[in-house]
């Protein structure tokens, strides 16, 4: 009976907290410090910031959309709203208008913007999580594991609180393979592969995939290989979760796991 009462109390309290907290969304904020001569960069490299106005020192999720580096647009997932945290949804330049490494450069610039600006809105820059779905998860891993991208912005990738990816590519992204003239089914690990940069001191990483029998391009196996290489290199805080019965589209069931990671 005690446990039932406690559960009811927690539910009522959390609903009451959500109702009392006001949220604001700022749209199309440019994340490069100075406009360049590249018109496409100036048009595309923007982010939306959703944040609680009545709380302080909240965590922030930087969210990169999917689309194979060829399509997609910034969107704040509904499941991340009204959870006492900020969400930064990022647009980045897309193929064929650009090629690698422009996608990664944009992702790093967006993460750098969050580190440099989130405190102005009440957030805690020590609680920044970098997350994404599919190619967005790929970008999350690249800017975290390959330290050179954030180093260009005078930031340490190890300052990221954690990484959660949903159905991410961990080998060289298939669109980049196409840029090389390769078939997308031909595996490649080079400088543009997250697994190439597996290292011991990286932030905590949670890898989530769909069912290995239903996922795209051996996605589960790629994630399993990254986790194995992280462990071999001495990385301690990593998880691999396979969601049975689901294919590539796992955002709806994956985001609750992301929230659980943040709330640990």
Go through each PLM region and give its residues.
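N-terminal cap/lid segment of alpha/beta-hydrolase-fold proteins
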Residues: 19-55
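The feature captures the conserved acid-bearing segment of alpha/beta-hydrolase catalytic domains
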Residues: 154-158, 162, 168-176, 184-228, ...
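Short beta-strand element of the alpha/beta-hydrolase
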Residues: 57-68
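Alpha/beta-hydrolase active-site loop
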Residues: 98-119, 142
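Short amphipathic alpha-helix adjacent to the substrate-entry channel of hydrolases
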Residues: 73-90
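Primarily recognizes the serine-hydrolase "nucleophile elbow" in alpha/beta-hydrolase
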Residues: 29, 115-178, 189-190, 194
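C-terminal catalytic histidine-bearing segment of alpha/beta-hydrolase fold enzymes
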Residues: 224, 231-264
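Bacterial Sec-dependent N-terminal signal peptides
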Residues: 1-24
